[in-house]
């Protein structure tokens, strides 16, 4: 996957799951580990890292401090 695709996946997970996106990605990461899917594990590790870099979802009409 390209860097752009990884960022797109991270953004999509945040849109779908809000502040639970990190937890969702972590569960998928664990599933890849249990399945011994090294490529899938790497992808989800990259997505998880990008979600954490994006920070928390701030509801519309509020400001982040």
Task: Please describe what each predicted stretch is.
Residues 4-6, 31, 60:
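Generic signature of intrinsically disordered, low-complexity, basic-rich segments
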Residues 11-56:
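Amphipathic, hydrophobic secondary-structure cores in small proteins
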Residues 1-12, 65:
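Short, charge-rich, low-complexity alpha-helical interaction segments
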Residues 53-65:
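Short, charged, intrinsically disordered terminal tails
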């Amino acid at each position: 996957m390209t860097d752009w695709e990884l960022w797109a996946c991270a953004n999509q997970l945040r849109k779908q799951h809000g502040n639970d996106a990190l937890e969702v990605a972590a569960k998928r990461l664990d599933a890849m580990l249990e399945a011994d899917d090294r490529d899938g594990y790497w992808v989800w590790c990259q997505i998880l890292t990008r979600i954490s870099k994006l920070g928390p979802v701030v509801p519309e009409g509020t400001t982040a401090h």
